Amino acid sequence: MLGALLLGGCDRQSAEPAQPAEAPQAAAPAATGTIDRSFAGRIMPAADLTAPGGATLSLAATRGKPVLLNLWATWCVPCVTEMPLLNQLAADYDGRLAVLTVSEDLQGEEKVVPFFEQRDLANLPRWMDEKNDLAVAFGGGAALPLTVLYDAQGREVWRVIGGYDWAGATARQAIDSAL
C-alpha cells in the first residue's frame, strides 16, 4: 500500500508511467514547488538511512548542523531534474549545511548506484530509505520530491513539495535566512 502511495505521489508533470525503467532525458519540467512554512517547528523524524555497501546513518546524529533533507526517486522526473542543482547547493554550502539526498526507490541500491555512476553528483550522499520510514513519517503519500530544511536543533524551518530551483536567488535567500 505504501509503495502505491509513493508511486502515485511524485509530482512528475508527465504522462510517463510512474516507474519507468530509467528516468527520461527529455526537457526538464518547470519547477512547481513553493516554500511552505506551515510545518515549522516539527522535529525531524527518527529514521535510519542506508548507503550502498551497508553504512548507516541515524537522522538523530545530524543534530548540531542545519540539514536540507531531500526525498527523491530515480523514476521521478522533477527529482532527477533537481539533483544537479542540489549537488551544486551542497558544494556552495559545504560546512554550513548538510544536504542529505535520500532515495525512496523500492529497489534501493539496484537503482541508486547506477543513477549516481551515470551522473557527476560528487557532493551528494547516496542515502536510501529502504523501509520507507521517512515516507511514512511525512504522511505515507508524500509527493516527491520533498525537501525539508531543518535547523541545527532538528526542527523544521520550511519544506518544498515538488521540483524547485535550488540555484535561484529565492532558494538561497530562504536557506541563508535560516542558517
Locate each region found by the language model.
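N-terminal targeting signals for export/organelle localization
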Residues: 1-46, 179
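Hydrophobic beta-strand positions
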Residues: 48-49, 149
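Short active-site neighborhood of thiol/selenol oxidoreductases, capturing the structured segment around
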Residues: 58-80
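Active-site acidic short loop of glycosyltransferases
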Residues: 63-65, 95, 121-123
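Alpha/beta-hydrolase fold active-site loops
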Residues: 66-67, 97, 145, 155
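Structural microenvironment flanking redox-active thiols in thiol-disulfide oxidoreductases
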Residues: 81-120, 130-137
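Thiol/disulfide oxidoreductase modules built on the thioredoxin-like
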Residues: 116-123, 128-178
